[in-house]
Curated annotation (Swiss-Prot):
InterPro entries: DUF1444. Belongs to the UPF0354 family. This is UPF0354 protein BH3252. Pfam families: DUF1444. HAMAP family: UPF0354 (MF_01548).
């Protein structure tokens, strides 16, 4: 399949009278915009092509659903007050925009050299990222939002599926609630996993919908973790980072030293 074929399929599936579709040939990007609101979403077709080659029609179906729910979210009037239990943190790459398309500065905190923490209001099938103007309008502080988000995060379940490779145990958290990677901010979960492992604890958040814990007991474990993390990163609809982290003394350490580190005895 080629980019032009993906473009054709998307244009057919996303053709609505209330939307305008425009295509940037140079960048190979399809823009979907609401005619009334003048807001919309842009799809980069080259990365989508790579996913189609791996996942087939499923990749296109997922993208169509993502656009439909995202466009519907633009229509909803969102307020923070009264929806405090729907505020959650989301992990994004440091390359993620600091402002939304309206030019409002998003509320975010630095997390690691690879990641940032943004804050979202859950709308059910979609979400909206909070920005500083919203907080000012509703007379709320960033500290209040952070506390609400982390409190709500701790209320989420933590279903883990284990897989063992060459003596190393890998735990996958994949509940598909939109906040799997966000659970890396749950310090009690990290500490619990730290106590559970026999070797070195490593953590990876390759994309929004998965969090990986690894109990590394030999050098083979590092190689497997790197491969698995890269695979998930390439498949993710919202990729975050292909680099795992070591967890020691309550801190997530950079992974460029991962291959040089030995598991604890």
């Amino acid at each position: 399949m080629e980019v032009r074929e993906i473009r054709k399929q998307l244009e057919e599936k996303l053709n609505r009278p209330e939307w305008t579709l425009s295509y940037d040939h140079k960048e190979a990007k399809l823009r979907i915009e609401d005619k009334e609101l003048k807001k919309g979403m842009t799809i980069a077709l080259k990365p989508l092509l790579a996913k189609v080659e791996r996942l087939g029609d499923r990749a296109i179906s997922e993208m169509v659903h993502y656009v439909q729910t995202g466009m519907a979210a633009f229509k909803k009037q969102t307020t923070i007050k009264g929806n405090e239990k729907r505020i959650f943190p989301v992990i994004r790459a440091t390359s993620f925009p600091e402002e939304n398309r309206d030019g409002h500065r998003l509320l975010f905190d630095e997390h690691t050299a690879e990641t940032r923490v943004y804050y979202s209001l859950d709308l059910g099938d979609s979400y909206t990222l909070l920005h500083e103007q919203q907080l000012s309008r509703e007379e709320m502080s960033a500290k209040e939002i952070r506390e609400m988000a982390l409190f709500n995060l701790r209320s989420l379940s933590e279903p883990l599926k284990a897989d063992k490779v060459a003596g190393n145990t890998f735990y996958f958290l994949n509940s598909n609630d939109g906040y799997d990677a966000s659970r890396i901010l749950n310090e009690s979960l990290l500490e619990k996993m730290s106590q559970k492992v026999e070797g070195q604890l490593a953590v990876a958040a390759p994309h929004q919908d998965v969090l990986i814990f690894a109990d590394i007991v030999n050098e083979r474990g590092y190689d497997v973790l790197a491969q698995v993390t890269m695979q998930f990163y390439a498949q993710g609809r919202i990729p975050i980072t292909a680099l795992p982290f070591l967890y020691e003394n309550g801190e997530l350490e950079p992974t460029f030293i991962l291959a040089q580190r030995k598991p604890k005895e």
